[in-house]
Amino acid sequence: KLLENRFNVVEILKALIFDLEKFTNEREHNQKVIEDNYWLFGEQFHLVSADKNFEILLNNYFAHLEIDNKKPETIDNKEKLKRPDIFISRKSDIPDATNNDLTIEENIIVELKRPSVVIGSEQFQQVERYLRFIIEEERFNSLRRNWKFILVGKKVDDYIIDLYENQKNKGQKYLVQSIRNYEIYAMTWD
């Protein structure tokens, strides 16, 4: 039954992206499917927030990390009202002979684009602004936190293809930017 349900989810996404392209938009269609089926990015992830602003995202993130705050966190930055589509996270134990408690956090922010939008400079810059926001807001940062920003659409343009070319020495398919423990990927649905 689980496999059948997952197969059906993939078929629904295919129909939304390839057959119903003119009618599909990211917020009402693709995002709802991904939000309910974030396993598409890995079984081990947990949904932290969907279509919420960065201030809510930070508070949900602290709850996910089991950081006990007496009052909600606030962010003093006008960009805090930006709303990434999906934010998922996981914690993994890292083998270390000197420290039994060492874990690494992997965080993924997903930005979905309607099938009619070709991913290019404008979409990349939107995700790059999210990356900059996370870097500049110290409460999101730690040496034990890795961040991936994944931009997903039906097609990419030459600008993105050039960014792939620029990052090919890193050995990561779809990678378009890498800074310290932050990476941006531009992926297509196929």
Stretch-by-stretch model annotation:
Residues 1-190:
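Charged, terminal alpha-helix-loop-beta segments
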